[in-house]
Amino acid sequence: MAALSLKGVKKSYGGAQYVLHGIDVDIADGEFVVLVGPSGCGKSTLLRMIAGLETVTEGEIAIGGRIVNALEPKDRDIAMVFQNYALYPHMTVAQNMGYGLKIRGVERALIDARVQAAAQILELGPLLARRPRELSGGQRQRVAMGRAIVREPSVFLFDEPLSNLDAKLRVQMRLEIQRLHARLATTSVYVTHDQIEAMTLAQRVIVMNRGDAEQIGAPVDVYEKPATTFVASFIGSPAMNLLHGRLSEDGAAFDVADGPRLPVAGAAGAGRGIAPGREWILGVRPEHMTPQPGEAFATLAVDSCELLGADNLAHGRWGAHDVAVRLPHAMRPTRGETLPVALPARHLHFFDPATGKRAG
């Protein structure tokens, strides 16, 4: 195991345009960090640079205190798990898991011992004599993880390993990866576009956007205090409702652009840096909009209602803004019904319209 450090890491492909704009992060020994963001944000490029599959244009990458910029992937003491498994079809599970050690000249007895140990961790014992074509998608991904485990690396790198699996298998594999990290405590960097994977697996999340690390923090902090409108809209399913408008001079109401006046008394409290009488982007998550007894509320004309099982999502519009409200299972408003909607001050977020950055 080892700490991983990125200092001012930039990437360009020969021109003036950078695809990574200076990433700075220190990942502690044994920490599980997830790089999350949409396609094209730079997360996979950054992972490939850590792995040594892409060169570093500027900055330094260090593993265990050793700068690895000039080292080949095989010399970085890393192991990588890919989206497409990358198993040899003519080899058995055991041979696939041990092949990386074999080509490095490791003794057969040690290879067998490590393969057996990894198979026990991943419950692959009964499958060791099978070939990849005889395995399910989830089993193949466990074999790919086993191949990484037998290396006993300082750092695990996961490149969207669950993308090829169906929804049920993704849930199962998330749990297995959590258990694996709890058992091995190996420094891990995991890339995904799926914010649910990021929230459930990470000790810290790095939200990537257009080559920048938009926010770095614990999943709960990123969810509860998004640093920008991008993070607010990307982390959370459904996304945070973001409303353009103006806070009244007394700070008690928010006038949605081309929409209704909303009661927000107490939202611009002392010390939050939220000036009344100016334009803001107001954010509120769908689960925080169900009114409690005695609360002031606005109303929303329901366009549709999604029945999700444990809860429901009502959808409507305020002006040009789509609005989603999460409701208890028993609340199922129909199209055209008027729904009372709360905007509790403690759950409101304000963002600067010019920069998209959080206030307060």
From Swiss-Prot:
<dbReference type="Pfam" id="PF00005">
    <property type="entry name" value="ABC_tran"/>
</dbReference>
<dbReference type="Pfam" id="PF17912">
    <property type="entry name" value="OB_MalK"/>
</dbReference>
<dbReference type="InterPro" id="IPR047641">
    <property type="entry name" value="ABC_transpr_MalK/UgpC-like"/>
</dbReference>
<keyword id="KW-0547">Nucleotide-binding</keyword>
<feature type="binding site">
    <location>
        <begin position="37"/>
        <end position="44"/>
    </location>
    <ligand>
        <name>ATP</name>
    </ligand>
</feature>
<protein>
    <recommendedName>
        <fullName>sn-glycerol-3-phosphate import ATP-binding protein UgpC</fullName>
        <ecNumber>7.6.2.10</ecNumber>
    </recommendedName>
</protein>
<dbReference type="GO" id="GO:0016887">
    <property type="term" value="F:ATP hydrolysis activity"/>
</dbReference>
<keyword id="KW-1003">Cell membrane</keyword>
<dbReference type="InterPro" id="IPR040582">
    <property type="entry name" value="OB_MalK-like"/>
</dbReference>
<dbReference type="InterPro" id="IPR003593">
    <property type="entry name" value="AAA+_ATPase"/>
</dbReference>
<dbReference type="GO" id="GO:0015430">
    <property type="term" value="F:ABC-type glycerol-3-phosphate transporter activity"/>
</dbReference>
<dbReference type="InterPro" id="IPR008995">
    <property type="entry name" value="Mo/tungstate-bd_C_term_dom"/>
</dbReference>
<comment type="similarity">
    <text>Belongs to the ABC transporter superfamily. sn-glycerol-3-phosphate importer (TC 3.A.1.1.3) family.</text>
</comment>
<dbReference type="GO" id="GO:0005524">
    <property type="term" value="F:ATP binding"/>
</dbReference>
<keyword id="KW-0997">Cell inner membrane</keyword>
<dbReference type="InterPro" id="IPR027417">
    <property type="entry name" value="P-loop_NTPase"/>
</dbReference>
<keyword id="KW-0067">ATP-binding</keyword>
<dbReference type="InterPro" id="IPR003439">
    <property type="entry name" value="ABC_transporter-like_ATP-bd"/>
</dbReference>
<dbReference type="GO" id="GO:0001407">
    <property type="term" value="P:glycerophosphodiester transmembrane transport"/>
</dbReference>
<dbReference type="GO" id="GO:0055052">
    <property type="term" value="C:ATP-binding cassette (ABC) transporter complex, substrate-binding subunit-containing"/>
</dbReference>
<dbReference type="GO" id="GO:0008643">
    <property type="term" value="P:carbohydrate transport"/>
</dbReference>
<keyword id="KW-0472">Membrane</keyword>
<comment type="subunit">
    <text>The complex is composed of two ATP-binding proteins (UgpC), two transmembrane proteins (UgpA and UgpE) and a solute-binding protein (UgpB).</text>
</comment>
<keyword id="KW-1278">Translocase</keyword>
<dbReference type="InterPro" id="IPR015855">
    <property type="entry name" value="ABC_transpr_MalK-like"/>
</dbReference>
<dbReference type="InterPro" id="IPR017871">
    <property type="entry name" value="ABC_transporter-like_CS"/>
</dbReference>
<keyword id="KW-0762">Sugar transport</keyword>
<comment type="function">
    <text>Part of the ABC transporter complex UgpBAEC involved in sn-glycerol-3-phosphate (G3P) import. Responsible for energy coupling to the transport system.</text>
</comment>
<dbReference type="InterPro" id="IPR012340">
    <property type="entry name" value="NA-bd_OB-fold"/>
</dbReference>
<keyword id="KW-0813">Transport</keyword>
<feature type="domain" description="ABC transporter">
    <location>
        <begin position="4"/>
        <end position="235"/>
    </location>
</feature>
